[in-house]
Structure formats: C-alpha cells, structure tokens
C-alpha cells in the first residue's frame, strides 16, 4: 500500500496529461470545413435521375389517387344513401350493410327512398 501511494500522484498526472493531449489533437482534426456550391456534375446528374424516376412513376401515382378518390366517393354515396333509407317514410325499407343498399323487407328488392 505504501508503494502504491507514492506512485499515485505520478499516475494521476500522467493520465491527466494524456487526456489533455488527446483533447487538443481531436480539436485540431475537426477544424476542417468543406463547403461546396452544390452545383457539381454529379449533383446535376442525380437531380436529373430523380426527375426521370418521378416522371416515370407519375402514371402510377395518378392511378392510385383516382382509385382512392373513387373509393371515397363510393363510401360517401353509401353514407348518404343509408341516411336517406333510415329516414324514409317507407316502413318496409331497411339498410343492408353488407351490400350497402336500401332494401324492401317484404320482397328483398332494392328501393329508392
């Protein structure tokens, strides 16, 4: 224990000095900053390729949007028809949720409320 206590201040000093040297060397390496204008041939080529891909997928995006809009319109019309059917003065009218139609209780045929 006596041998260790004599060397302890020396070891602590060496560790502290090593950390200071390490910290200053790290600061010196991170002082570089590279600024590009962003107008290189590679960036123009990349932008051109992205534009091509965007144009190629345009038709697919339009199809998806049309399908989504069509499904929404169908659901909206079914909601309106359900309200009309439930508020109908015809006591034999009922709403069939599976087929989204207003049916006659007696015949099972589609009716317009």
Swiss-Prot record:
Q: Does the keyword Signal apply?
A: yes
Q: Which UniProt keywords apply?
A: Signal
Signal peptide per UniProt: 1-28
- HAMAP family reported for this sequence: UPF0482 (MF_01581)
Q: Which family does it belong to?
A: Belongs to the UPF0482 family.
- The name under which this protein is listed is UPF0482 protein YnfB
Q: Which organism is it from?
A: Escherichia fergusonii (strain ATCC 35469 / DSM 13698 / CCUG 18766 / IAM 14443 / JCM 21226 / LMG 7866 / NBRC 102419 / NCTC 12128 / CDC 0568-73)
Gene name as annotated: ynfB
């Amino acid at each position: 224990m006596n041998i260790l206590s004599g060397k302890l201040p020396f070891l602590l000093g060496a560790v502290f000095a090593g950390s200071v040297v390490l910290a200053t060397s790290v600061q010196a390496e991170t002082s570089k900053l590279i600024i590009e204008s962003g107008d290189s041939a590679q960036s123009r080529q990349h932008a051109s390729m992205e534009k091509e891909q965007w144009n190629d997928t345009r038709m697919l995006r339009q199809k998806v949007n049309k399908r989504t809009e069509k499904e929404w319109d169908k659901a909206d019309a079914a909601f309106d028809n359900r309200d009309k059917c439930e508020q109908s003065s015809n006591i034999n009218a009922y709403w069939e949720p599976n087929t989204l139609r207003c049916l006659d209780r007696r015949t099972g045929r589609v009716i317009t409320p």
